[in-house]
Amino acid sequence: MLDYLMRKILVTSALPYANGSIHLGHLVEYIQTDIWVRFQKMQGNLTYYICADDTHGTPIMLMAEQENITPEKLVENIHKEHLKDFQDFHVNFDNFYSTNSLENKELSENIYKALVKNNKIFEKEIEQFYDPDKKMFLPDRFIKGECPKCKTKDQYGDSCESCGSTYNPTDLINPYSVLTGSSPVKKKTKHYFFKLSECSDFLSNWTKSGTLQKEARNKLEEWFKAGLSDWDISRDAPYFGFEIPDAPGKFFYVWLDAPIGYMASFKNFANNNKLSFDDFWKNNSNAELVHFIGKDILYFHALFWPATLEYSGYRKPTKIYAHGFLTVNGEKMSKSRGTFITARSYLDNIKNPNFLRYYYASKLNDSMEDLDLNLEDFSVKVNSDLVGKFINIPSRTSGFISKYFENKLVPIKNIEDKKARELILRITEMKDLVLEHYELRLFSKLTKLIMSQVEALNEFVSTKEPWILAKNKSEHKTNSDLHQTCSTCLHAFRLLSIYLTPIIPELSSKISLLFKENPYDSFSNIEIEAVEINKYEHLIHRLDLKNVESMVDSDNK
């Protein structure tokens, strides 16, 4: 059994980049994090969920240029869109901010100055590709050419999609600028570097401190053996971002100020809510700092980020939880494969966010394995589990309580049937296991555990046949059996609904109304017993496969 004493926890999800819409791949992480945060809050832990849009970099500068608006206006528009998508999927941030903020500028500059003071920054002349027509240095993804290993054409400047090789942009054969099509020239420039190579001993010890999953530690060991390279933290103008102090025309690379955005978002939240920033970020803070990320940004979060914090005087993360990628029908998400789906397209066509939240939960665990959204399986599973089994319980039994017993439930202590009492007791006593699965992010195990009891409850209903009992209810024994059978089912259903609240919060709120209660905001609701119900109203509609097909079509035309 886990220790559930009151904790202080600051939780983050990776910052979505402000150059496009939220898609179903993004939502894996935000739903996973939101479930865990809701669980912690229902436990009574002081928990804050912080995020922000990642707003800096060349892609945003160029996108704004194409749309003939300022980068500031672009990221403002994207922020509104992102926030609406998250809200409609019931991802409940305490603060969703922006890295293009005064707080982030101040923190980035102060952290940089601390790194300089600690002799962790140096200047070096490097050679990069430069587009003479656009008059700018080209990031890796804005250069294409032939792969130096397999000779495949039109590959990006950092890696080959054909053979998987990684390389420097200057290794490309016949390189060209993605922006203008012209041949880039090599040009020397001075950049600022963080001495990551000097941090190997600290990072090697820190990454073994229990902060990371075993798979993540193993991956880091590979990087340690290969040797850590110093990190280029600067970019040349023109660039949308924060200018480096005392370095005109040089800007912080987006990956320096983006994670500092966690701090900035919390600082903004703390200032607006009279909280102490230092209580969560000072070096000896007793609060937990938990990052949820995708495995593709493990290098930044498990190496650059803790080293930056260590040598600028701030606390390090308590836990970093990395998850795998989403595939759709076994394929990588892409328009060319017909597997790219935005959050808004899902909402426009399927409408019910509970379905995706539940399906993702049924697939998620504590590993970095990829998970697949098989659209046919998705439709079958949510219809079977949520509609056919879970909501089937009140739809089969609550009507009898309203029609024959004035909406009153038999108190649990007065239920005489042995199997009925055992059923409720079993569901009540699995609370500790439910909480443990939530804490350890074993959501797949959790949903299986709950569904096993949902199935047992449906079997109980089928065995008792309340619809038959209702026909013979004039007999006292039959009338009592009908009342107790339906009350058993509804008491048990209510308990299971409380367990599922972090996963399907909106549906849980509707269920609480059935029992004339406020939305379930604590697992202590388990100890309270419902005494009567409202008349049953339809809680959920089946998912039509046609809606799934129209969702796919709308994003992949």
Where are these regions (language model features)?
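Structured secondary-structure scaffolds
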Residues: L2-C51, E103-L107, C150, S159, ...
